[in-house]
């Protein structure tokens, strides 16, 4: 499905948006002998299929299918275009331009909104995410994450959930990235950031590396369930305000004394931390 080259660090940006745009019953798209497209979990063609051919990648261009969007609506969809992600040095990530048929005016419309680079495409991922941001793996469901939202952005940062790096699966790294990018400290789906906020992301696998000589300060350490340690909030909330949101979860995981610590110390005390980030120190006026 997808990976990216390790990015030259300008700085990455945090995003409020999360929720995936499409869930659908998934196996593999297939093409039978009379050229009707189906999924292996969907309704088969009325014609007898003598041969089933797996269709993937660019061969999916033009495929139409029925599926369910994030609001539970059954809609008609079409894959208008498929291309390799130009940011993926391994050339294994496909970007899909997915349209849906709007019943209000019978017009085909792009499912995704354009991102900062004016790209309105999606990357498919197995499983689903609920309103809290929790991921449930399933071989029968895929989720299309738009390039303007965190599911796809974390893949393009290098955290491909189907990959293994240095013997470690990147599934949990991808999930931790979705929490970190949105400053979802409690792991309950609530964001504590603003669109376009610069952050410096790094990990011990070397997928993302800390930028030297930045004016940013260590903010938090992360795993798939949210923050494992909060040194200081990204924006104007105080640590006490965030603690009130999930007091039991963050007990002993917040910098209480006001002396800022480092990611290295957090890693020593909390070895289950996967990702770390720095951010700009902000003060209320």
Which residue stretches match the model-derived regions?
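Short, Lys/Arg-enriched N-terminal segments with co-localized hydrophobic residues
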Residues: 1-6
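Signal peptide processing junction and immediate N-terminal pro/mature segment
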Residues: 26-40
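Aromatic-enriched hydrophobic runs in primary sequence
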Residues: 31, 49, 54-56, 60
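Eukaryotic low-complexity, mixed-charge intrinsically disordered interaction/regulatory segments enriched
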Residues: 37-54
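Long, compositionally biased low-complexity segments
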Residues: 56, 61, 66-285
């Amino acid at each position: 499905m997808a990976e990216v080259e390790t990015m030259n660090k300008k700085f990455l940006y945090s995003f409020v948006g999360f929720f995936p745009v499409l869930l659908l019953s998934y196996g593999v798209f297939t093409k039978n002998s009379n050229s009707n497209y189906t999924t292996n979990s969907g309704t088969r063609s009325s014609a007898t299929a003598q041969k089933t051919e797996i269709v993937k990648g660019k061969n999916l261009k033009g495929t139409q299918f029925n599926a369910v969007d994030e609001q539970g609506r059954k809609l008609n969809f079409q894959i208008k275009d498929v291309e390799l992600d130009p940011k993926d040095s391994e050339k294994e990530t496909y970007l899909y331009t997915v349209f849906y048929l709007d019943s209000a005016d019978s017009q085909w419309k792009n499912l995704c909104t354009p991102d900062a680079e004016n790209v309105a495409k999606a990357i498919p991922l197995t499983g689903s995410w609920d309103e809290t941001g929790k991921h449930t793996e399933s071989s029968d469901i895929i989720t299309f994450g738009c390039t303007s939202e965190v599911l796809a952005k974390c893949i393009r940062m290098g955290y491909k959930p189907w990959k293994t790096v240095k013997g470690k699966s990147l599934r949990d790294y991808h999930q931790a990235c979705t929490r970190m990018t949105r400053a979802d400290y409690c792991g309950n789906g609530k964001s504590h950031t603003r669109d376009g906020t610069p952050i410096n992301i790094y990990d011990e696998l070397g997928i993302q590396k800390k930028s030297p000589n930045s004016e940013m300060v260590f903010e938090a350490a992360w795993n798939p369930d949210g923050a494992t340690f909060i040194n200081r909030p990204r924006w104007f909330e105080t640590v006490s305000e965030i603690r009130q949101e999930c007091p039991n979860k963050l007990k002993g995981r917040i910098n209480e004394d006001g002396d800022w610590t480092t990611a290295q110390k957090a890693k020593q005390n909390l070895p289950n931390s996967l990702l770390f980030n720095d951010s700009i120190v902000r003060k209320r006026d």
